Amino acid sequence: MVRNTAGEVLFIFRNGKWDLPKGKTEKGENIEQTAVREVEEETGVTGLEITEFLLHTYHVFKRNGEYRLKLTHWYAMETEYNGVFAPQEDEGIMEVAWKDETATKEALLNSYENIKLLF
């Protein structure tokens, strides 16, 4: 979960829902490196600093007819970035936005249950 200097949270809009940037670890990466890389790739936001580990979440999804359990490691990050966003459209990301407390509450009404656990 990324916050800027104003305390706003970085959200992505993908598959008709507000979500937080995340992704899979690549060969040779540790989990913290993955977290930073995925935010940069999915949003264009740079200058990220991990401040703390938050929690793990789990969710079940179906791939090729089989159910799978996905573990996500969540970190708190901060940035002073105030540049232009670069949504990773080939990953289905249609919008990137900073959201204040009121807008975050609204976004969470159209989000995933595991994302709501972070707030």
Indicate where each model-derived feature is located:
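N-terminal strand-loop-strand
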Residues: 1-21
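Short, intrinsically disordered, charge-balanced linker/junction segments flanking boundaries
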Residues: 1-2, 115-118
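Alpha-helix C-terminal capping segments
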Residues: 12, 118-119
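Short, surface-exposed beta-strand-loop junctions and turns on beta-sheet-rich folds
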Residues: 17-19, 27, 113-114
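A short, polar/proline- and glycine-enriched secondary-structure boundary/capping micro-motif
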Residues: 19-24, 97-98, 118
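Unchanged
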Residues: 25-111
